[in-house]
């Protein structure tokens, strides 16, 4: 345990803007939970989720991306303006955040071309100029009266938010939303007072901020998010980003510096707005540092894959920023600020940047985290449950699922025995723990091991459980978490000495000398190709299907494709391996037979759940559960969620 106030003096120092006091420099960056009810308001589940983050000690909690245009907004699970409707759930959310000691912030946005970015047909979206989007959507240039209307809408929405109880307003002027569309010289080629030089291109945002101040008074701080650089080929760079910040300086109380313009349809910019595991932690900090050199009145915040409190403290101490924003880290561990303040930094659950949370939110409207099974379930987790009757629980298998099951059961007061047949906890995924871009996985396994060591769990390594052994333990409950095994494809030549499984290569990349062909373009195969490239090993991938298999995580797929493109890794889709030889792989592809030369062949074609191995324990206790990969070969998210669900209700019903 560290002395927090000596170790993190900047991170824990309070901040005051006008009459609004922030208890530290750790802010929750704007997100919405995708839990939206029919009239565009946050659901009660959302209210509970945001309150949980406030309970964790963050200074400010922001509910994000509320569209202000009543006529033209993004369709689907997005929050909408609060002027023309009852705002009771917004008021509940603000109250919930404030009663936990945090500042309640509402982020307002004008979508502009985002309203039609992925759809064709229908009425045109509004934007700086006329254009046709890649998916066929039309954009109409905004006349001045429409621009002035939206400025008024920003002011009116901010006033409604203030009346609903929000303490601060944030404007989304980054990531390709409407205000940034006007800031961008690549998109805004207008010749009137709303386009041309930097001052004109920022006029929309400046007038929106000033309107909010005019209607709400100087006692409500205003923050604006900007992209310090669009980081796309034809976009503006940090020099222009600093000029934009200079125009906003003194109008906004806080300039929150992100990067990117996701309306430009590049995987590389999405992987930086939502920093993927392939980029260093804090990769975007230098943009904020440059902006801070150019502003004199506004505070500057930084964001982007930050999860290490020591790094955060250094950023503030070096004067690179005044505020640290966290998005996914506070989904992964909402207690992060409290753990920093209490000196329990070794217990922080660090985000792996797997992007499951984003993919699930966009795809299904679920708020979820691969390694925090309680997120999105706050109303369930914190409701009163019957006290559990103490049970003796035997967990078989010490991988991701087994560790979580043991910890959850132990936390609920049960007597837990955790058996692992190998000499260490972690399971087969340990093979990836030393991969540089999987540092988050390594941190997570290390944390789970440490928590198990601190608990009262009876850990038995090098213990292979049989039904007979299980019965001698007299368990009330058995949780089978025995995992899965790699599938070995039935291809002629698969047993040759130059053929390896992906797990073996992850453990020992030196097995590969020269060129490699990888069979399978799931995440195991594609990430392995990226990893091998860092060792100077060229690999190409053969995939039977027509696309990368993403396992439901389309967002991480985008990040993987970004790296595949950057590293120039060939993928042969719709191609079947028919024979492995001593010098390569003979395949059948869309254009007929093809031969890919290789010194080594690596198979990564999936995992087989160990159903039978798990089911042999089904009659060894009165209650039996199968969790994780022995139930279904999936991912860490599935392993964690099934483990938590199985363990939480033990002894209660």
Where in the sequence are the language-model features?
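A short helix-to-beta-strand connector/capping loop
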Residues: 296, 320, 452-459, 495-498, ...
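Rossmann-like dinucleotide-binding cores of NAD(P)H-dependent redox enzymes
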Residues: 415-455, 506, 531-575
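Short loop/turn elements that flank and shape the SAM/SAH-binding pocket of Class I
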Residues: 232, 465-469, 578-580
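Short acidic/histidine-rich motifs immediately flanking catalytic phosphotransfer sites
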Residues: 58, 252, 474-476, 597
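Short beta-alpha connecting loops at secondary-structure transitions
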Residues: 271-277, 322, 429-437, 544-549, ...
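Rossmann-like dinucleotide/flavin-binding elements
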Residues: 310, 387-418, 425, 460-474, ...
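Flavin-dependent oxidoreductase catalytic cores
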Residues: 1-396, 400, 404, 408-416, ...
